[in-house]
Amino acid sequence: MKTRTTVLTAILTSILAIALSAQRGGRGGAPGQQGTPTPPGPPRVEELKKEVAADIETMKVATQQMVDQVFSFGELGFQEFETSKYLTGILEKNGFRIERGFAGIPTAWVATWGNGKPVIALGSDIDDIPQASQKPGVGYHDPIIEGAPGHGEGHNSGVPLNVTAALAVKKIMEREKLPGTLKLWPGVAEELVGAKMYYIRAGMFRDVDVNLFAHVGSNLGVSWGAGFGTGLQSIEYTFKGESAHAAAQPWRGRSALDAVEMMDIGWNFRREHLRLQQRSHSVIVNGGDQPNVVPPNASVWYYFRETDYAHIKELREIGDAMAKAASMMTNTEVTSRILGAAWPQHMNKTVAETMYTNIQNIGLPKWDDADVTLAKGIQRELKQPQIGLATQIGQLRGGLDPEQNMGGPSDDIGDVSWNVPTATLGYPANIPNLPGHNWANAIAMATPIAHKGVTAGAKVQAMTVIDLLMRPELVQQASDYFRNVQTKDQKYIPFISDKDQPALWLNEKIMEKYGPEMKKLYYDPTKYKTYLEQLGIKYPTVR
């Protein structure tokens, strides 16, 4: 009875963690120890932080244009060509050195400005979601292009936030002659958890002192320590058999699809005997060509998620054994390849506490009636509580007991967090109570809600960079936590081998299909103030 009560308590705690995170918009944010905001710095530091925030306020139009432009590109993972060309163009014009094609990934890049220590990295994701096309500002399902991808995770907003912050900080660094280096980078193919482990292998973070990440949410928030959620391995299993006429001589065939189905059946029976924390799911990516041909080739794609390295590795081993068993039962051959991976996240206490002080100073944007009307409109459409938009920032949380983590989503920022002191800023560019990875999550992402949320987030990010540049004790404390607490007992072990390569072919066919029509609707800021205006959308449109 005691064990059952403990498990139920852990489940309820995990549910609360997810609810709090969704409400605050932070990545992590699970209950645990309440953090302590970093005390204000010396007067000159605080003066410069106020100055950088005021400067970002004057950059609102440029920020809005970046957010809208990337939204209109709507590119899937590994296919973010227009997005990367556009963003690197802005940075290059502002004096950043650009290294393109980083880690052998055509859409990956690093933009660097400055010299010396500390080296502060600013990262955020840029890819979007299949079949999530949606007109912004419209509070019901209304695709821009039916079936096309769209920013149903809000990844059009994070790098514009970082660019805004970096340009404002750069101005102060030049004037004040502050030593230090700014390093901007994009999260390519995050929805495939497909790139960041290759960045690490290629050395992107070897000289970085602190990494500040940004991810869209519905509130301003940050947490430290082990958050809720999981890491994962993304594995494709391909079975090879022998074709035959499915009616005339089926006994001469060896069905690769049978092997896929046997593996899926086996895994579904195995679920009952796996830990509650695990999440596993699959899609059949090749199931044959037509019913009258015994499929000679078939593939299934699995995500194996767990809360720590050892259990993720164990799930992969179970999957491999099950695939081998399925091949034996069907007299087929099986091979596998890794398409992506992510470590569970662990965020830095010092960096998070520093960031939270700036969150308190900036606070949430001032939402107007139109913003709240759109938010309540889509919440009503989805039959969710009509709470509107966030009006109060959450608490700084951290130090979650691993036993309280009952699983959840994954993000390959986890790999980065185990290689350099990292904190993730959740910023209020979206609407609470949305399902995630859905057309509904694209509704706000080229509207004043996103524009205001990104500006608020850029202020927090820039102020945190100023703190790190001018208060070397914070960088040292962040390093101490990373070395003496986070990685004292657990070291980073990559899920990829030296021979594994990024899955660059993923999403090619989808973008080839929809890209030409999407290109006709790219945002043109020389003709229209906003993307809403270009699309002829009255803000807000609800029913």
Task: Give the positions of each predicted feature.
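Bacterial N-terminal signal peptides
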Residues: 9-19
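Histidine/acidic-residue-rich, glycine-tolerant segments that coordinate divalent metal ions
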Residues: 141-150, 156-157, 173-295, 305, ...
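Acidic-enriched catalytic cores of C-N bond-cleaving enzymes acting on peptides and small amides
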Residues: 250-286, 291-293, 306-337, 345-387, ...
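Zn-dependent metallopeptidase/amidohydrolase metal-coordination segment
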Residues: 376-458, 476-543
